[in-house]
């Protein structure tokens, strides 16, 4: 009995996922360690720089928990979108096999990055909890929905830049450049309410602001972020994914044969 298209894709993605693990980490344990060290280093540096100031301005909020719920979502977005851009070149030889499609490589990479950073998030949240910092997951559903939309958004952005970058290779260099200022305007190091309201209309166009603030709301009792919206995040994500899939559909054959 012939397998359905979904079953074929599932098997393909599983094989690509295992290949990504071997490629990403190989035989070296340091690869797994680096996944923990990178966000930990960011956390420690920002705690050292802003810890005292933020403790004075937000005395009832755990600053390590506040930071973690900004850093990890940004790392998920950055890692999935960046690694999606180079997915074709890294797996070019596999496209000789008929079942393997470029979009499968993005799904496999997104799954791996998600598992890595969810594990890192849980581990670091446990560490700060054992260190005496308080948090409580008051809205687990909101947290899951927010992060799910974040992952889909990251895939959509990666898909757009992968397709466009295949036609115009210089575009592959644009995404890393765009991510640098995003780090500073996504409310990672500061709460939205610390910004004068006249500037909110500009910041709130950025979907990562909604991701970060909604994540904090879900795990920090009493933290309410005015202005952010799960509906806006969902709409932005779906539009981005639609554009990515539309571009991919028109260029899939060209990407496979180039």
From Swiss-Prot:
What the entry lists under Pfam families is as follows: ABC2_membrane (PF01061)
What organism does this protein naturally occur in? Escherichia coli
Keywords assigned: Cell inner membrane, Cell membrane, Membrane, Transmembrane, Transmembrane helix, Transport
User: Example GO molecular function term?
Assistant: ABC-type transporter activity
- Annotated function: KpsM and KpsT constitute a system for the transport of polysialic acid across the cytoplasmic membrane.
User: What is the designated name of this protein?
Assistant: Polysialic acid transport protein KpsM
Residue ranges annotated as transmembrane are 33-53, 61-81, 110-130, 144-164, 175-195, 227-247
GO annotation, cellular component aspect:
ATP-binding cassette (ABC) transporter complex
User: What PANTHER family is this protein classified in?
Assistant: INNER MEMBRANE TRANSPORT PERMEASE (PTHR30413), TRANSPORT PERMEASE PROTEIN (PTHR30413:SF8)
What PROSITE patterns does this protein map onto?
A: ABC_TM2
Q: In its UniProt record, which GO terms are filed under biological process?
A: lipopolysaccharide transport
* Record InterPro entries: ABC2_TM (IPR013525), ABC2_TM_bact-type (IPR047817), ABC_2_transport (IPR000412)
Q: Kindly give the membrane topology term recorded for this protein.
A: Multi-pass membrane protein
Instruction: Identify the taxonomic lineage of the organism of origin.
Output: Bacteria, Pseudomonadati, Pseudomonadota, Gammaproteobacteria, Enterobacterales
Which compartment or compartments is the protein found in?
A: Cell inner membrane
Q: Where is the ABC transmembrane type-2 domain?
A: 30-251
The main location is: membrane
Query: Which family does the UniProt entry place this protein in?
Result: Belongs to the ABC-2 integral membrane protein family.
């Amino acid at each position: 009995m012939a397998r359905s298209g979904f079953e074929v894709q599932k098997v393909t993605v599983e094989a690509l996922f295992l290949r990504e693990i071997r490629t990403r980490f190989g035989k070296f344990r340091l690869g797994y360690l680096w996944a923990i060290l990178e966000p930990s280093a960011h956390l420690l540096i920002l705690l050292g720089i802003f810890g005292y100031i933020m403790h004075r301005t937000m005395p009832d909020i755990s600053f390590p928990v506040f930071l973690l719920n900004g850093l990890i979502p940004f790392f998920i977005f950055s890692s999935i979108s960046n690694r999606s851009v180079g997915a074709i070149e890294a797996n070019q030889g596999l496209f000789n096999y008929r079942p393997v499609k470029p979009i499968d490589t993005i799904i496999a990479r997104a799954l791996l990055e998600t598992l890595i950073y969810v594990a890192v998030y849980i581990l670091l949240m446990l560490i700060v909890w054992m260190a005496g910092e308080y948090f409580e997951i008051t809205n687990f559903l909101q947290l899951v929905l927010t992060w799910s939309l974040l992952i889909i958004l990251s895939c959509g952005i990666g898909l757009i830049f992968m397709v466009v970058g295949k036609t115009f290779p210089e575009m592959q260099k644009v995404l890393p450049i765009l991510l640098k200022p995003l780090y500073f305007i996504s409310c990672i190091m500061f709460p939205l309410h610390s910004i004068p309201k006249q500037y909110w209309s500009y910041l709130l166009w950025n979907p990562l602001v909604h991701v970060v603030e909604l994540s904090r709301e879900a795990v920090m009792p009493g933290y309410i972020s005015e202005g952010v919206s799960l509906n806006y995040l969902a709409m932005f994500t779906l539009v981005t994914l639609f554009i990515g899939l539309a571009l991919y559909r028109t260029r899939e054959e060209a990407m496979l044969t180039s």
